[in-house]
Amino acid sequence: MADVEPEVAAAGVPKKRTFKKFAFKGVDLDALLDMSTDDLVKLFSSRIRRRFSRGLTRKPMALIKKLRKAKREAPAGEKPEPVRTHLRNMIIVPEMIGSIIGVYNGKTFNQVEIKPEMIGHYLAEFSISYKPVKHGRPGVGATHSSRFIPLK
């Protein structure tokens, strides 16, 4: 009888929800934001390490500058204004988290909200540049046997 009472008391109180804390390769988000670029690059994959070792050109730095400005001008608690870019090969870094970027796919700008899970990926991965194929019925000549089907 003594075993049942704590269970009933616990059932009456709503259980607190616990959310998974984000970590990139074992490093939590706050530490990532404070980390220097050299330390951060060590956590990335070899392809991205190579890209950073070859140096950042003027274009990616200009995008980060625009993102900083958009975040600074946004009212507290509001999302920043979208920043449009053609830089599909830009690597997402922790500083970009929370920003909204319009990534050009060759036709339109797809708005992408940067989340912590996107760190270390390219912007292009979140803005598909082609329309996936929806296969219909095969046409005449699609297979060898379809040659003998008379045309209507």
Curated annotation (Swiss-Prot):
Give the family, as the similarity comment puts it: Belongs to the universal ribosomal protein uS19 family.
Compartments reported by the entry: Cytoplasm
Q: Which SUPFAM superfamilies match?
A: Ribosomal protein S19 (SSF54570)
Question: InterPro entries given for it?
Answer: Ribosomal_uS19 (IPR002222), Ribosomal_uS19_CS (IPR020934), Ribosomal_uS19_euk/arc (IPR005713), Ribosomal_uS19_SF (IPR023575)
The protein's gene is named: RPS15D
What keywords sit in the KW lines? Cytoplasm, Ribonucleoprotein, Ribosomal protein
CC terms in the record's Gene Ontology section: cytosolic ribosome; cytosolic small ribosomal subunit; nucleolus; plant-type vacuole; plasma membrane; plasmodesma
Any one biological process term the GO annotation gives = translation
GO molecular function terms listed in the Swiss-Prot or TrEMBL record:
mRNA binding; structural constituent of ribosome
Specify the species.
Answer: Arabidopsis thaliana
Q: What is the protein name given in its UniProt record? A: Small ribosomal subunit protein uS19x
Q: Which HAMAP family match?
A: Ribosomal_uS19 (MF_00531)
One Pfam family assigned to this protein is Ribosomal_S19
Fetch the NCBIfam families from UniProt: PRK04038.1 (NF003121), uS19_arch (TIGR01025)
Superkingdom of origin: Eukaryota
